[in-house]
Amino acid sequence: NRIAIWGWSFGGFNTLMSNDKVAYQIYPKSFLDTNGDGVGDLKGIISKLNYLKKLGIDIVWLSPVYESPFVDQGYDISDYYKIAEQFGTMDDFDTLVAEMKKRGMHLIMDLVVNHCSDKHEWFQKALADPDGPYAGYFYFREGKDGKAPSNYRSYFGGSAWTKVPGTNKYYLHTFAKEQPDLNWENPVVRKKIYEMINWWFEKGISGFRIDAIINIKKNLDFPSFPADGDDGLVSCDKMLASAHGIGTFLEEMKHETFDKYDAFTVGEVFHLKEDELREFIGEDGHFSTKFDFSAHVLSYGEHGWYDAPALDFNRWRTALFDTQKADLTVGFEANIIENHDEPRGATHYLPAHARNEAGVKMLAATYFLLRGIPFIYQGQEIGMTNCVRNDISEYDDISTKDQYLAALNAGCSKEAALHACYENSRDNARTPMQWDNSLHGGFTTGTPWLAENPNYTKINVTDQLNRPDSVLSFYKELIALRKAPEYVETFTYGTFAAAYEDVDHMFAYYRTNEETGQRILVAGNFGTDTVTLPLEKPADRVLLTNGKTADVILTRNRESASLVLGSCDCVVLLL
């Protein structure tokens, strides 16, 4: 049955041998700079492959390294076939792929094909002749009564339509005006995209993380909708939700590209209904997997993240558990607590009392052993945190600046707006990687493109490599446990069942191997009070703990068939 359900392939090796793998996202600009220009580069990544291998990483997701003006940090691509000069050369990229293969590691790249850069050759030709063939590569529409064709708001604020000077034509951009949306209705565009994808596969990569892919299908009537803000605009999501038939595009792309190379694909997909899961990540789904963003949507208020409510533990736990339950008979999700678009998990998901090494380890264990493929974002493995900034000028991120202005326009004080940025800005995840306690955290000998978090003197790789009780050491143990031969079947294919949901601030669940009967309890106490949990029977073994020794836990457990967890305690028990 498992073979029938999980028979897709992954970068040339069958998924039955790959679902136990661990992935790691690298944001190249902030990983490691080797030439002193303040920007991370491919040679920096190559130099740290042994570090990643020793951590237990099998798959590396590389955020965009293509040629770009970097209006949106590389998600505005001006040439899909070139490496941005600041990252190095194509020879450097080829070396990276080769060195990863030597270590049995796989590289997946970012695929950004909902839009390109306004500096891309296609768009420049479209602007030169808005009625010519290249205009058909994008969405150009006539204005109405001197206004934009419809009232959509882009993700980065302002109208999603920008006027072409000297004409009455507007082009659509669901992101920044420098990121015009590609017209997927045009078969020539699709063909060129597929050719590009296959070109990268021929260079030896194993797959793609697919950016904003739901956006490629538009409602071609581009109707206006009732405004959802004082600006008279409505989120472009409203238009996208009214579009139908995206599956046709996704299946064609899969057939023309991914299937030919047994590729691993992970989709950036939001707001799927439960009855759509199989279409996207089932046995014959559009993608191998997708990220679980159920917790991400809790971080938004009515007008973005500046007015987001404080994270509610019960809502967060319920969101993750609901995803786990929905996936059981369908496929695998990619589990994350951080990425380049999110604040740091150590700050975002942990209450104030748990923002310490014990709390970070607890968060790691409780998410990492869920059913699905775990992704780690650079710096997460050492517990990097959000960074306090004193002025909006210290931020680089385009969406952060938009949300800051939105907060001020809504009547928030400068202090409140900056605090919202501290809590939610994407730049929190983009500060330089903290390698050691030297100047700039060992990231660069120059001036970093984005100022480092000052806590690099206390939170850094070198310090934690030398401490067996560090967060980094705990992640190594966690990865080793998930891959251990005696438990790998349970952690990879075992069922999920929530546990102790009636206990306040308890994040607990069972992973069960239905073939062997092996049953494992994962439990973390996110609250401030000590909690005693009754067990079905005394535990057989403590597989991992972030605090008390295994002997202490088992002694108490065998005396009363119960588990005592203090604040921030987490434990993995073989029952």
Predicted regions and their residues:
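Active-site and adjacent substrate-binding regions of carbohydrate-active enzymes
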Residues: M17-L575
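Alpha/beta-hydrolase fold nucleophile elbow
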Residues: R2-S9
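Short glycine-enriched nucleophile-adjacent loop
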Residues: G12-L16
